[in-house]
Amino acid sequence: MRIAILGTRGIPASYGGFETFAEHLSTRLVARGHDVTVYCRAHYVSPRQLESHGVRLKVLPTIRHKYLDTVVHAFLSALHAVPARFDAALICNAANAPFASILRGTGTPVAINVDGLEHKRKKWNWLGRKYYLLAERLSTILPNETVTDACVIQDYYAAKYNARSTMIAYGAEVERKPDRPVVRRWRVEPNRYVLYVSRLEPENNARMVIEAFKKVRTAYRLLVVGDAPYAHEYINDLKERARGDRRIIFTGFVFGQDYRALQQNAYCYVHATEVGGTHPALLEAMGFGNCVLTL
């Protein structure tokens, strides 16, 4: 089959959960003999990169703005996919649901992976929240199939929209390699640091984690792994709160083998998110057998 994946920043993954999902899904589909194209954003993947591990990459522009980045790129991706006549398309993020009509209208079957309850995120103004609620409803109407990644999200769509969805839980790739020298790059010792991984946005409660850790009397360190492209003020506030406590270390985004080394050598993992879907980082921490503290 010829399959298109739309609605993420693209692959190779170096941002968040949907990108990690798209990379794992696309490469596994290719390994099974399918022809897969992942649509990527030009400020995230080089336009010169045409392929990744057998997956075709189509890099398109977008408008780099908090409210437009995702939907503009998904719209352009859907338009580009029409003449390609894919056998199936997967759209990530309920925000992109309106564009399912473009593909279905030209005969391409469409599934949407809706993610979490984005309308509850504080980063959106009232108009953004209203749009997300509309897009949620459309994600139960326009595609051929609505996909949820957790039972609680499946139950939400059933209760709010009386909509059936297919729940497909994420897995985690666990490869144990005691790569201890890697973690020392961040001035930590194996099994002597607490790991927090997330996009640094208010609903993921990095502020709460930092303030709680500051009250703990311990020589262990806190590694804050993550970033966010449109949350500079919030991130600066986090770093200001951590100022003076040398135990708290901000790493930015970490992916690949370095990230896996951080997971498998952590003393424990802290999960403090409120409104997202299933976070791959949580599953990976569980897969590595980490002690997990949840909000």
Locations of regions flagged by a protein language model:
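Conserved donor-binding/catalytic core segment of Leloir-type glycosyltransferases
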Residues: A4, R184-R217, L223
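An aromatic- and histidine-rich active-site surface loop
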Residues: D69-V82, F86-D115, G277
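Short, structured helix-loop element that forms part of the nucleotide-activated donor/catalytic region
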Residues: P47-Q49, R221-R247, D258
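Membrane-proximal helix-turn-helix segments that form the acceptor-binding/catalytic region
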Residues: L79-V82, G128-T146, D155
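Short hydrophobic beta-strand element within catalytic cores of glycosyltransferases
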Residues: C291-T294
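N-terminal strand-loop element at the rim of the active site
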Residues: T8-S14, R28-H65, V152-A158, A228-Y230
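Short alpha-helical donor nucleotide-sugar binding micro-motif in glycosyltransferases
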Residues: F253-V254, A261-A266, A285
